[in-house]
Amino acid sequence: MTLPIRTLDLPSLSLRDALDLAVLVDEEAKERYEELADQLELHHTPEAASFFRFMANNEEKHRLELASRRRHLFADSPSTVHRGMIFDVEAPDYSEAAIFMTPRQALAVARRSEEKAHGFFVELLAEIKEPEVAALFAELRDEEILHQELIDREIAKLPPDEPFAAADFADEPVSH
């Protein structure tokens, strides 16, 4: 995996920059989940959209916790990390949302995103020299495992998907 970040000197990353990076990762994921939820609502797939809204809320809660830690440690000192430096760290791919998506399929999308985030933090840790930064990224890496376990428990509660996809029975679009 190539790290989806640009122009960051990882070995010399400060704790402030690491917290800013983590806040941005959660912000990006939250926004993507909201976009996918909007898309699925348009496609009349409310159960899957609802799960993506749940994930967006979780990402926002985590973002706020990290932002609070950052403010506590560094007050309002300016950030040197910005959104242009990251792309698709934890956010689901846009192509993941599909018409007639089931809740089980939505959970699988979220699971893949959490796996992607875990891999990101594992790779980051290999580059980091600063002990405080390494500790933060190790904490975030471990949280991604907890998120995967949460999703696995939710998947286990669901009935199996139907053997046939709903899209197989959909009418073709009508032209006028």
Residue ranges and their predicted role:
Residues 1-176:
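Iron-associated oxidoreductase/ferritin-like identity signal
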